[in-house]
Amino acid sequence: MTAREVPAVERLAAGVELPEFFHYLGMSVVKAAADEAVVRMQVPKGLLSPYGPVHGGAIAALIDTTIGVAVACRMPHGARTATHELNINYISFSKEPVVIATARVIRLGRTVAHCESEARSEAGDLIAKALATFGIFRK
């Protein structure tokens, strides 16, 4: 079986289809399933703000990536997705070196997926909550 024949859930869990950007930011897939995606980010020093907390842009990238994994796990082979809208509410900040995001698809249509996500510190403190709309591009 080639990598393209393996279901998206398995490919994502194995890191097969993850861009270099994903690894550059210290991300790793913890869970890639039809019901939920979980991505962990070991925050590189360069992603800390001048005052110590993890930069909000790094949190946004983690949330966007985690939602992308959640949507990809629900897609038929060959379909692609792209972020249309991402609304993040930052609740708190984290100075911890690990941030974990979870995401799930709320509604999956033919061309659009509505999703939600949250990012937490490794200790479980809520950092941000997000809603997103992803476009679905089928072959």
Language model features with spans:
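Terminal targeting signals and extreme-terminal segments of soluble enzymes
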Residues: M1-K139
